[in-house]
Amino acid sequence: MVRNKYYVVRKLADVIYALPVGQGVVRDYPVMQLGALEYDIVRKIDQDENPRKVFDELAISYMIAEEQRDSFWEDFCTAAEDLASCNIIQNYVVNEKLNSRTKMRRIKRFR
């Protein structure tokens, strides 16, 4: 079953664009947790690339032959879904929000 790449990438782009840090997500992001493909996906979208072109551009930059694109597509979908469902990114956002709330509570407590 071939998954709709536009849906997956659009969903991923929405998650990345929703990050509070905005542009430069890759620089402010715990990159050590990312695999190479995930990092490249985030980097491409972070550069204001059109999300619909991300898959094709990565396939070209990885020199994936036409006959191997289906296999690469499955890897791409898995990486995009991991990022979008947010095993990584949403945890980062949640931790940032929790950290800021904790800081606010501490500030209020000491006033």
What is each of the regions a protein language model found here?
Residues 2, 18-20, 62:
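Residue-level detector of functional hotspots within protein domains
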Residues 9-40:
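Short alpha-helical segments that sit at the start of domains
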Residues 30-111:
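Long, charge-rich, low-complexity alpha-helical segments
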Residues 1-14, 111:
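Hydrophobic packing positions characteristic
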Residues 5-9, 19, 55-57:
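Generic detector of short, locally flexible boundary/turn motifs and exposed helical patches
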